[in-house]
């Protein structure tokens, strides 16, 4: 009989997911959403269940996956904020420092890095802990298998979680489903190539059609999502390389993927980073 169950909390901002993995008494939240308000809603779901929140596990250092961590921690002071590696912790600190410098944390000031200038900010170095292994065990029973040895892909460093009890792979942002993928600032061409290779590796490892694939953005799927993501990334590179302007590249991706969410942010920033307009500026 399965010990663990998984619930998806679908965030509205960025179409990002948080997941609650729980047994009868304890829970782990995987990723904490993009804003304080939605994280507070997530906290209420956990509180209403009557379970103890054991940990907030952040899969990688992009803000839509960790901005809500302080809100959850304040709701559940005994919960640990965990990452899989020192590299992911460093990514989180560095990204937050950069976001503060360009004003991207002005709407979420509680997550500005703590400093003399922002004494009420978040103490990333002190509050985020490194798991220190490849297994996270829930109090009350149930193991999560953590992997973080991926090369740079959608993020510089990334962790996935496999839940054997549920035959479920939580891919974080290695997969998106019905949502345009982030290939913007920081995602180099070589990282996209790595990403395609990693998806091939995951397809081979999780070939069982009964495996549930939980993406970082969008609805649950199955192992066919790995190939669909590879095609999407190939189409994206073909669009930004094959069109004369960013507008044309955007239009091509919209035609290929009608109904996909995040055209105005994730796709737009990705095209702006890789597209013909950026190449023209570099050549000038």
Language-model regions, residue ranges each:
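Short acidic-hydrophobic surface loop/beta-edge motif
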Residues: 9, 21, 133-139
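Metallo-beta-lactamase
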Residues: 34, 143, 148-228, 235
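Active-site HxH/HxHxD metal-binding segment of metal-dependent hydrolases
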Residues: 48-137
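Conserved beta-strand hairpin/beta-sheet module of binuclear metal-dependent hydrolase folds
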Residues: 2-48, 160-173
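Accessory terminal helices/loops
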Residues: 153, 204-212, 219-284
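Extracytoplasmic/secreted cell-surface and envelope-processing proteins
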Residues: 38-39, 64-67, 91-92, 179-180, ...
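Loop/turn elements at helix/coil->beta-strand transitions in domains of secreted/extracellular proteins
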Residues: 25-26, 51-53, 77-80, 142, ...
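Short catalytic-loop micro-motif centered on adjacent basic/acidic residues
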Residues: 28-31, 55-59, 145-146
């Amino acid at each position: 009989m399965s010990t663990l169950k998984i619930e998806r909390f679908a965030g509205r901002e960025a179409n990002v997911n948080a997941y609650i993995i729980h047994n009868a008494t304890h829970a782990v939240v995987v990723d904490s959403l993009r804003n304080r308000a939605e994280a507070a809603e997530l906290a209420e779901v956990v509180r209403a269940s009557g379970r103890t929140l054991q940990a907030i596990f952040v899969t990688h250092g992009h803000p839509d996956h960790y901005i809500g961590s302080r809100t959850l921690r304040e709701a559940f002071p005994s919960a640990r904020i965990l990452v899989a590696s020192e590299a992911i912790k460093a990514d989180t600190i560095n990204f937050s420092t950069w976001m503060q410098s360009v004003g991207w944390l002005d709407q979420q000031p509680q997550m500005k890095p703590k400093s003399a200038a922002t004494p009420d900010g978040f103490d990333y170095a002190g509050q985020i802990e490194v798991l220190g292994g490849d297994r996270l065990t829930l109090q009350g029973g149930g193991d999560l298998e953590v992997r973080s040895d991926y090369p740079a892909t959608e993020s510089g460093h990334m962790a996935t979680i496999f839940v054997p009890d549920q035959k479920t792979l939580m891919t974080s942002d290695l997969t998106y489903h019905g949502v345009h993928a982030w290939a913007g600032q920081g995602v180099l061409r070589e990282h996209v190539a790595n990403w395609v290779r990693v998806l091939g590796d995951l397809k081979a490892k999780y070939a069982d059609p009964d495996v549930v694939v939980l993406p970082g953005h969008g609805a649950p799927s199955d192992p066919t999502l790995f190939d669909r993501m590879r095609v999407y990334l190939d189409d994206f590179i073909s669009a930004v390389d094959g069109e004369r302007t960013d507008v044309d590249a955007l239009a091509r991706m919209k035609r290929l993927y009608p109904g996909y969410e995040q055209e105005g942010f994730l796709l737009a920033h990705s095209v702006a980073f890789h597209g013909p307009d950026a190449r023209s500026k570099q050549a000038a």
